[in-house]
């Protein structure tokens, strides 16, 4: 019997494939089962084109048999089988695809597809076996042949006996090594788990004889083992069922079975698309944040199937980061696969699916916001932060997609509102969308800077997330209304008369303010009369793009560079404290220095900033109490 050489590449290529392409050895079973499914598909196709043939589904199945004692694993099918020439052409050439050739030779009709890439996928058998035998009898032939190979050195083909058409793959499982436990691929539980994981939705039954126990007939207290045939796979995935046949409970059960979360989904999306690219998808929006969601360990992505065969557990390319909380599956027959499903080529079809999914999620969230506000607010409590990161990231390129999904707490409504709702009720004379930043709504309400805006009757949005102001700086405006912090130097709300009065106050007290600025030794950019304060004596305002709150966030990051916002100390000249300042300036410069330091540190504390010298601050308080 002649040993033939592989026609494609030498041992180096086969070694490269085994060691590099396949990252998980268990996928060998997925590949071989997929090839068996292809073989049955070909029989089905023949029945579509030959009226003399009848496809009786019960006669077509895949069987997996484990023989632990002899270290043999068999995968058999009742598919179309292979002739001697097909064995040589399909198995003698690495990466030769019999399924692909079959597609080329036959017009593929609607509803019919072949998932396999025969060749490299088949050779994944060598991941777990160093002796692979294929026994096959082609449909309509009286002859059967046995193909055998022990690795890259070559293969043999010889006639053999086989009663029925179909193919049987016999793997001699490798012995264990220090690095690998090959015994597991002979265990019923492991084989069943691999089938459920990768091949649960193959449309033909995958059968195994499973070990069961039952009480002995002569002694009910003792048990004996017996074998019982079971179909392991579900065959019909939920996403291929008619949506009208499914209930919310069915989706919730699927969510739980897939271990997407311990909660119930707040929203599920079942979509089927036919067009340039065709796919089925079920997407879930969770109710609560996964415990690791905001950690580097969290991995976004959807399960990706090709015709019911799992390709990737988490395909991150299907979701933008800002929708990374979405769970679910996508199944398509249009994906381009590079080298037997293990490496997915990020091609045009995948990008089209990702684009469609992004739009679908956005539309569903907008619908949830409009029709089920309570549910949306619950979702936003968990994942609003992620949407705001989406606005900020990638230089704001996604802001138009996400801006209508944002919500903030409102000073007027005392609840969460959208930007559209805020703008819709702005008075005609209001130029800006005003916001205030703080650690909590309660602290923001007590900010001195907010008094002037509220006194004008304007609504203020409360920013309590550290990402909020960064996102809004990237957004810049909404419906042609710019955003303005209540701590900004110019609020844009004063009338001409008040503007002139304020400028007059600065001129009148110029020397006092310059003296206070000098006493603060560069800690503030300026000291001036406040246009915004009503009841408080002092506050800090900021000049420029970097706000005081942004300074706090940036300096809290690892390896901070001690970034400082340009601060302005604003004095309420209508407050009694200002009279004390004027008296000290005119008669006691040392007391003026004491008052200036106290007011500056008071303003820092109101902003939640650390004071430079707490001991000096408390000593100064004691001085004025004497």
From Swiss-Prot:
Its main location: cytoplasm. InterPro entries: HATPase_C_sf, Heat_shock_protein_90_CS, HSP90_C, Hsp90_fam, Hsp90_N, Ribosomal_Su5_D2-typ_SF. Residues 342-552 are annotated as: B. Keywords: ATP-binding, Chaperone, Cytoplasm, Nucleotide-binding, Stress response. It is found in: Cytoplasm. Transmembrane segments: none annotated. Residues 1-341 are annotated as: A. Pfam families: HATPase_c_3, HSP90. CDD domains: HATPase_Hsp90-like. Molecular chaperone. Has ATPase activity. Belongs to the heat shock protein 90 family. PANTHER family: HEAT SHOCK PROTEIN 90 FAMILY MEMBER. This is Chaperone protein HtpG.
């Amino acid at each position: 019997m002649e040993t033939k050489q592989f026609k494609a590449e030498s041992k180096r290529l086969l070694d490269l494939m085994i060691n590099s392409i396949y990252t998980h050895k268990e996928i060998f079973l997925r590949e071989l089962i997929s090839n068996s499914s292809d073989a049955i598909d070909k029989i089905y196709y023949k029945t579509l084109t030959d009226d003399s043939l009848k496809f009786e589904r019960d006669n077509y199945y895949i069987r997996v048999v484990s023989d632990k004692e002899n270290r043999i694993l068999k995968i058999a099918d009742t598919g179309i089988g292979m002739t001697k020439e097909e064995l040589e052409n399909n198995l003698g050439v690495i990466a030769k695809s019999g399924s692909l050739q079959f597609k080329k030779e036959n017009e593929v009709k609607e509803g019919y597809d072949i998932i396999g890439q025969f060749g490299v996928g088949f050779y994944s058998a060598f991941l777990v076996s160093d002796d692979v035998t294929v026994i096959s009898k082609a449909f309509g032939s009286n002859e059967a042949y046995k193909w055998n190979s022990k690795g890259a050195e070559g293969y043999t083909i010889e006639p053999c006996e086989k009663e029925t058409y179909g193919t049987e793959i016999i793997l001699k499982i490798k012995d264990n090594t220090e690095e690998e436990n090959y015994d597991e691929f002979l265990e019923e539980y492991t084989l069943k788990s691999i089938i459920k994981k990768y091949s649960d939705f193959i449309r033909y039954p995958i059968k195994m004889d499973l070990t069961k126990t039952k009480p002995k007939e002569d002694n009910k207290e003792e048990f004996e083992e017996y074998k019982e045939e079971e179909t392991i796979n579900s065959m019909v995935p939920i996403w291929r069922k008619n949506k009208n046949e499914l209930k919310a409970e069915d989706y919730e059960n699927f969510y739980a079975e897939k271990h997407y979360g311990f909660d119930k989904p707040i929203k599920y999306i079942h979509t089927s698309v036919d067009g340039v690219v065709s796919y089925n998808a079920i997407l879930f929006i969770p109710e609560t944040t996964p415990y690791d969601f905001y950690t580097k360990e969290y991995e976004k992505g959807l399960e990706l199937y090709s015709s019911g065969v799992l390709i990737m557990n988490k395909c991150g390319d299907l979701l933008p980061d800002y929708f990374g909380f979405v769970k679910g599956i996508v199944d398509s027959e249009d994906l381009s696969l590079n080298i037997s499903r293990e490496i997915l080529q990020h091609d045009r079809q995948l990008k089209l699916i990702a684009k469609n999914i992004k739009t679908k999620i956005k539309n569903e969230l907008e619908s949830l916001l409009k029709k089920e506000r309570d549910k949306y607010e619950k979702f936003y409590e968990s994942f609003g932060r992620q949407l705001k990161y989406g606005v900020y990231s990638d230089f704001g390129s996604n802001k138009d997609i996400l801006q209508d999904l944002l919500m903030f707490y409102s000073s007027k409504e005392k609840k969460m509102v959208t930007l559209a709702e805020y703008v819709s009720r702005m008075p005609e004379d209001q130029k800006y969308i005003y916001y205030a930043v703080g650690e909590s709504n309660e602290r923001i309400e007590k900010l001195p800077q907010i008094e002037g805006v509220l006194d004008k009757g304007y609504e203020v949005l409360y920013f309590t997330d550290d990402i909020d102001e960064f996102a809004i700086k990237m957004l810049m405006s909404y419906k042609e209304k710019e955003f303005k912090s209540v701590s900004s130097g110019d609020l844009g709300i004063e009338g001409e008369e008040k503007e002139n009065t304020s400028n007059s106050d600065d001129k009148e007290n110029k020397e006092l303010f310059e003296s206070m600025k000098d006493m603060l030794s560069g800690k503030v950019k300026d000291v001036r009369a406040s246009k915004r304060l009503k009841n408080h004596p002092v506050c800090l305002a900021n000049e420029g793009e970097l706000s005081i709150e942004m300074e706090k966030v940036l300096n809290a990051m690892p390896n901070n560079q001690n970034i400082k916002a340009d601060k302005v100390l604003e004095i309420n000249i209508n407050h009694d404290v200002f009279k004390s300042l004027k008296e000290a300036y005119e008669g006691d410069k040392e007391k003026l220095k004491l008052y200036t330091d106290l007011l500056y540190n008071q303003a820092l504390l109101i902003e939640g900033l650390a004071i430079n010298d707490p001991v000096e601050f408390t000593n100064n308080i004691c001085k004025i109490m004497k």
